Amino acid sequence: MAAQAAPELAKLDLNKNTGSVEANAVSAGGSEKEEAENEGDSDDDRDDEQAGGSAEVNAEKKKKKKRPKKKKKTAKVQSSPPRIPLTTLFPNSNFPEGEIVEYLNENSYRTTNEEKRHLDRMNNDFLTEYRQAAEIHRQVRQYAQKELIKPGATLTDIAEGIEDGVRHLTGHMGLEEGDSLVAGMGFPTGLNINHCAAHYSPNAGNKVVLQHGDVMKVDFGVHINGRIVDSAFTVAFDPVFDPLLTAVKEATNTGIKEAGIDVRMSDIGAAIQETMESYELELNGTSYPIKAIRNLNGHTIGQYEIHGGVNGKSVPIVKGGDQTKMEEGETYAIETFGSTGKGYVRDDMETSHYAKVPNAPSVPLRLSSAKNLYSLINKNFGTLPFCRRYLDRLGQEKYLLGLNNLVSSGLVDAYPPLCDVKGSYTAQFEHTILLRPNVKEVISRGDDY
């Protein structure tokens, strides 16, 4: 908000000055007879009266008090830890837009096409919800980078610190039935260390502590009315890992640059792989080529469906394969993963991530615990992914038998951690982009990445 200029100081009353001068003139004038008789004294009288007039003006100056200066209004800033709802900081819902990128090559006409600009202006609600979610993601991750993600911190403290920030900034704490469906976490916070690339979040009782030599991927989502912003970054404290992080960050930026309406997925994957695999990492005297993890992909994002639902599309990060094209109006998570290992991940470690299967067929459930849990999942998460800590937070106890029954019945999908070979290091960077009619908007772009 622009600061209000301080009001001007009160001006002198010129009328009173003028009145004093006129009074002096009358006193000095008098009758001609008196002037003739007292000619010698009249000059002194005029001097005295002029002095009196000056004293009167000075007295008036002293009587007029200066108005107190109004305090300048300062723009509200986010607290630390983040607790101020974003709508308080942006009361008019004029949230910052993401990075605007013009379409390349044959799609460049869209940038200037009047009809496309008109269609784009019609999507204000859609854009407002995405931009709100993106700004929350930026503010929370910047706090996490400065205050939470440090050697010696537990993964549980980091995850809960991020999630508490998101809930406060959306204004929805998710403790009342259905509240998490209005706004909140788009999916659980992934904190994936070293050879683990994705889908690891601490369960209750987790004691893992972040170490100085770790490479950790931080992946979390924010949603407003089901509009999910999916963005991730990698943290390494030892600069020896900088080439790995740079390779993956540049590969993601290449994917964003190549993405666009009518662009083939295979072309994007080829460009990503070429960029990433031009780097190598030297560790303890050994050079490791950085490989794109070939069985991990970017993806479309649907409303309340992180992977786009049954008609979702995948964005490969290696060459070959899918000839499907991107289309106008779609939302994509452009994410790339690099590894010093085999460049291929498998299920490993304890599962934390789950999600209800969209449009799952009706299945009879024999376990009452499974029935009750499925009802709770429907009412609180819908098709949004959740983790076991979220069930703990809602007061659920001894639910693992029912949860496993829902998975085996095909009503809920389990997403175990995805890992390359032990001893390897993996990195990830990810942004959400909107293929608007006239431009693509990198909605989650920030100053950090």
UniProtKB/Swiss-Prot annotation:
Cofactor: record remark: Binds 2 divalent metal cations per subunit. Has a high-affinity and a low affinity metal-binding site. The true nature of the physiological cofactor is under debate. The enzyme is active with cobalt, zinc, manganese or divalent iron ions. Most likely, methionine aminopeptidases function as mononuclear Fe(2+)-metalloproteases under physiological conditions, and the catalytically relevant metal-binding site has been assigned to the histidine-containing high-affinity site.
Pfam families referenced in this protein's UniProt entry, alphabetically: Peptidase_M24 (PF00557)
Record bears the keyword Cytoplasm: yes
Cofactor: Co(2+); Zn(2+); Mn(2+); Fe(2+)
Catalysis performed (reactions): Release of N-terminal amino acids, preferentially methionine, from peptides and arylamides
Acidic residues composition-biased segments: 34-50
Location(s), subcellular: Cytoplasm
GO cellular component: cytoplasm
Purpose: Cotranslationally removes the N-terminal methionine from nascent proteins. The N-terminal methionine is often cleaved when the second residue in the primary sequence is small and uncharged (Met-Ala-, Cys, Gly, Pro, Ser, Thr, or Val).
Name under which the protein is recorded: Methionine aminopeptidase 2
Organism of this sequence: Arthroderma benhamiae (strain ATCC MYA-4681 / CBS 112371)
Classification lineage: Eukaryota, Fungi, Dikarya, Ascomycota, Pezizomycotina
